[in-house]
Amino acid sequence: MEKATVNQQKSGPDKTVETKTRLRCTPFLLFDGNCAEAMTFYQKCLGGDLTLTKLGDTPMKAQFPKEKHNRIINAHLKSGAIDISAADWMASPDFEPKRGNMYAIFVIGKTYGELKKVFDKLKYGAEKNRFQDLHDMPFGIYGQFYDRYGVQWIFKGDNKK
């Protein structure tokens, strides 16, 4: 069994708290319609198992126009210690993909509680215009924001609240 580590982190301006976590962080890449092509290329180079899920194959398709239904909503490449997640861009034209905003840190956990503890610490000073609090989605728990340093954090939990 994996041993939890103890870290000291600041939450808010001057508050230090002790945190134990079993969360995993992996790179998360965003593509503009070519996620399947890119991730297939990475699989050919790195080996491993690749899972691709199209938006049109999920209940979420009703929330998007048909022209986005072939976009990848979830891609996952696992090869030994290599673990990369990705998706095609689904955001509005006001926030189009460009170099520099096509990556994120993907925080993966099992329960709402363990995600919420870290989410609430990291969101301090986060940008408000792209903030999504943790909420239930068809695939589990989801939330995202850009922190006060401009880094995008995406949270996903296996279980719903």
Descriptions of predicted regions:
Residues 2-23, 51-53, 73-78, 84-89, ...:
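Vicinal oxygen chelate
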Residues 19, 29-81, 142:
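Core segments of cupin and vicinal oxygen chelate
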